[in-house]
């Protein structure tokens, strides 16, 4: 083997070892499309971590998990995950009929042991949607059953998250267009771009809090479960540097049903 081939082999081997050593982030949602909450953060971190997603339900409200609705929702979730570089996993709870029972918690605990995530990102625990509250309660119990101690971050959902304390604001301006692409993969839920419009309003509000003197920024809000021990870094410390804002966005109040971002 000549020196050129030897160097090339060594480089490939090193790259493979680095890829294998990458830590994991697990996002937990109640339904296919709840990824729209932390999409920006996931996109910002996907080059440093392996991102996985677990949905407790398959999105077929009060229908069976093998219904056409469930198949459509799962297909859209897979398409969204492909755009975001995420590996999806699906639970078997019924949409609108989800329960945080022992079997449910043990199934997720098994996945947690396999993935050993550095961080778990989930719904805030007080939420207008009962499936969201169930998913967070079951996840916290599953983490205990798995014997793990990952960082836990809660993400914000439009109007559904109730009284969530905001500990972190993450600037997602650089990946906003990519977030829109991911949201639009949920075709049956994003009717008339309603989810895009809602996330745009949320993002502009949080962006104005993060950068009061700089119009045009978009941000996501997060709450943490508990302070990390001294010397242990949050995944938020791996966020890439922000790019300069080229041109402030012109924001117009949307009319009912109006698409405000294209």
Annotate the PLM regions:
Residues 19-115, 141-148, 238-241, 255-261:
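Active-site rim/loop-helix segments in enzyme catalytic domains that contact anionic ligands
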Residues 34-35, 60-63, 96, 126-132, ...:
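Active-site environment of divalent metal-dependent phosphoester hydrolases
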Residues 1-9:
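Sec-dependent signal peptide recognition
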Residues 78, 140, 180-184:
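Non-transmembrane alpha-helical segments in soluble domains
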Residues 149-151, 155-262:
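The feature marks non-catalytic terminal segments
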Residues 109-126, 135:
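Proline-aspartate-enriched helix->loop->beta-strand connector
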Residues 130-143:
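Short Gly/Thr/Asp-enriched flexible loops that form oxyanion-binding sites at enzyme active sites
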Residues 11-19:
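Hydrophobic h-region of N-terminal signal peptides that target proteins for export
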